[in-house]
Amino acid sequence: MAEKFAEKTFTDPQQIRNFCIIAHIDHGKSTLADRILQLSNVVDARDMRDQYLDNMDIERERGITIKAQNVRLPWIPRTGPYAGEQIVMQMIDTPGHVDFTYEVSRALEACEGAILLVDAAQGIEAQTLANLYLAMENDLEIIPVLNKIDLPAADPEKYSLEIANIIGCEPEDVLRVSGKTGEGVEELLDKVAELIPAPTTDYPDDAPARAMIFDSVYDTYRGVVTYIRMIDGKLTPRQKIKMMSTGAVHELLEIGIVSPTPKKCSGLGPGEVGYLITGVKDVRQSKVGDTVTWAHNGAEEALQGYEEPKPMVYSGLFPISQADFPDLRDALEKLQLNDASLTYEPETSVALGFGFRCGFLGLLHMEITRDRLQREFDLDLISTAPSVNYRVVAEDGSEHRVHNPSDWPAGKLREVYEPIVKTTIIVPSDFVGTTMELCQTKRGQMDGMDYLSEDRVELRYTMPLGEIIFDFFDQLKSRTKGYASLNYEEAGEQLADLVKVDILLQGDPVDAFSAIVHRDNAQWYGNKMTKKLKELIPRQQFEVPVQAAIGSKVIARENIRALRKDVLAKCYGGDISRKRKLLEKQKEGKKRMKNIGSVSVPQEAFVAALSTDEG
């Protein structure tokens, strides 16, 4: 079987090509990966399905890739200097979304080259640019490719020029393929064999093993499956291995390659990508970016390490029925096995009961985590409005880090610092005005703008992260008819005039509705929430004031009118004084009720107030 040569390991590094695909959501990355799998015959025609590498339901449904996947493929180029030779390709499929930049950066570390995939009908997007710059920083060989050339709307001439300007190549070097029809894919694979350098190592074959972890997944039966890229030396089954950052020693139970399904093998040599299983049950034991080496006579220094991904956005997750709290805790633990960047801590709220304060990489990450909790674990959740990490200096000079409005210190504050991000927005030139206006209302400062081509503009702004996480992205899309693309990266912090707005029901604050907002927006937030709650909370037997306040100063108020029984119905005709007596009696009753009555906010009101157009 000539075709199965990729299943033998300890391949000569000269025959190996490690590459990944960088592309924006919907630019056809998974479809191209499907075609590549078919052409190299590693997937039987009958097993083939669309988006073969996207295993999670939510990935297939949203058409996005969340976890990096890797596949080892055999290929015999038909053209170029390596024609007729057996080349083993290792393709690592990366996520394209801004929140998962960390996943991308790890996948890039494991490769020598990258295919830059751009939709021939849309051109390059902001997030693809960010990932492209990451790849260039890692000195990867970039192969530019235009996909979807079979579309009637495709304009390959225009976009080849745009890509050529960005990465500094000739427009004719940009390859043209169609993942759907398979046109040009073989030429692309031949180009990969020709242009992407083979992995190199500075050490002899018998040097201590060093392998970098670029992903880890939790398998219910076998524990944690760790994906690694071998840099130096060899790893074989039944060896004792050590994780260099934690110093933990494990026994290698199984080592293998993924060719699209996991296959055991006799070990991995330099430059190869595969997986290992140690029977450990906790993903945090195999940290992404860590170095694996032999426990005995192992390597001295670790590879280029990774920083831990830091959560940027926080939100409280509460089960709708308190009985689900233990299930929510188990579900979060299981999710954390697969997603090391998710952080959580228990939190209690007077209004919502017990729940967790979770930290996410960004908004999409938050949405997907919530979706997965609801879908995979059947939980009904309320999530509070997202917030970010603030640094607060009190009057006495003490510092606090606050990411939950209920921890906001009372009394006077000397200064408050909020995180800021550098954003890159790519928009068609017709929408530059409205986009700039939107960024200014969100307290953005312009850093510069460039024309990528005559009708596409790149705008660079520094903005507070707190303004972006609410509804910035939705507003940006609606103002630009869906054509804008956004990328952001953190850029430190700045002094800001922020206040905490409390929502009071009958004079008592409801912690779930509190928010930290800029003083200029406090009035708007207060008005919006009081109006919304006035509609959502059912009328009581007595009048209920809904107020928004900063400290003790009320800035907005709405009244929920009392329900009144018609006490005069049984009073036919009769004297006015009789009617007045009944009305006075009713009034007294309402007054007494108002003093002792409490307002119960129905669950739906919480959900509606916190979820709709989170502004």
UniProtKB/Swiss-Prot annotation:
Its EC number is 3.6.5.n1. CDD domains: EF4_II, EF4_III, LepA, lepA_C. One of its GO terms (biological process) is positive regulation of translation. It is an enzyme of class 3 (hydrolase). It comes from Corynebacterium diphtheriae (strain ATCC 700971 / NCTC 13129 / Biotype gravis). InterPro entries: EF-4 (IPR006297), EFG_III/V (IPR035647), EFG_V-like (IPR000640), EFTu-like_2 (IPR004161), G_TR_CS (IPR031157), LepA_C_sf (IPR038363), LepA_CTD (IPR013842), LepA_IV (IPR035654). Belongs to the TRAFAC class translation factor GTPase superfamily. Classic translation factor GTPase family. LepA subfamily. GTP binds at residues 26-31, 147-150. It is a peripheral membrane protein. GO terms for molecular function: GTP binding; GTPase activity; ribosome binding; translation elongation factor activity. SUPFAM superfamilies: EF-G C-terminal domain-like, P-loop containing nucleoside triphosphate hydrolases, Translation proteins. Keywords: Cell membrane, GTP-binding, Hydrolase, Membrane, Nucleotide-binding, Protein biosynthesis. Its main location: membrane. GO terms for cellular component: plasma membrane. This is Elongation factor 4. The gene is lepA. Required for accurate and efficient protein synthesis under certain stress conditions. May act as a fidelity factor of the translation reaction, by catalyzing a one-codon backward translocation of tRNAs on improperly translocated ribosomes. Back-translocation proceeds from a post-translocation (POST) complex to a pre-translocation (PRE) complex, thus giving elongation factor G a second chance to translocate the tRNAs correctly. Binds to ribosomes in a GTP-dependent manner. It catalyses: GTP + H2O = GDP + phosphate + H(+). Pfam families: EFG_C (PF00679), GTP_EFTU (PF00009), GTP_EFTU_D2 (PF03144), LepA_C (PF06421). It is found in: Cell membrane. Residues 14-200 form the tr-type G domain.
